[in-house]
Amino acid sequence: MPVAVGPYGQSQPSCFDRVKMGFMMGFAVGMAAGALFGTFSCLRFGMRGRELMGGVGKTMMQSGGTFGTFMAIGMGIRC
């Protein structure tokens, strides 16, 4: 598929670049949401210290990966 050229001679990002950008944006949003929800749920369970950091970090990575994957799929569909 030929690459479209913008009005000033700039080429548009490739489909892979769009999927990659979708994943990165989704991962960032998922990490932020995971930090909020993970902190709340870990504090509710009474975690403190190293256990709290581990629980929040795990929740951040899980929600970041999940939301990033869905955003990447959505951007791939739009290509």
Swiss-Prot record:
One GO term (biological process): replicative senescence
Keywords of the record: Antibiotic, Antimicrobial, Membrane, Mitochondrion, Mitochondrion inner membrane, Transmembrane, Transmembrane helix
Transmembrane segments: 23-43
Pfam family, any one: Romo1
Region annotated Sufficient for antibacterial activity, chain positions: 42-60
Known function: Has antibacterial activity against a variety of bacteria including S.aureus, P.aeruginosa and M.tuberculosis. Acts by inducing bacterial membrane breakage.
Family: Belongs to the MGR2 family.
Membrane association type: Single-pass membrane protein
SMART domains, per the entry: Romo1
GO cellular component, one term: mitochondrial inner membrane
Domain of life: Eukaryota
Leader sequence segment: none
Designated name of the protein: Reactive oxygen species modulator 1
Main localization, broad class: mitochondrion
Compartments where located: Mitochondrion inner membrane
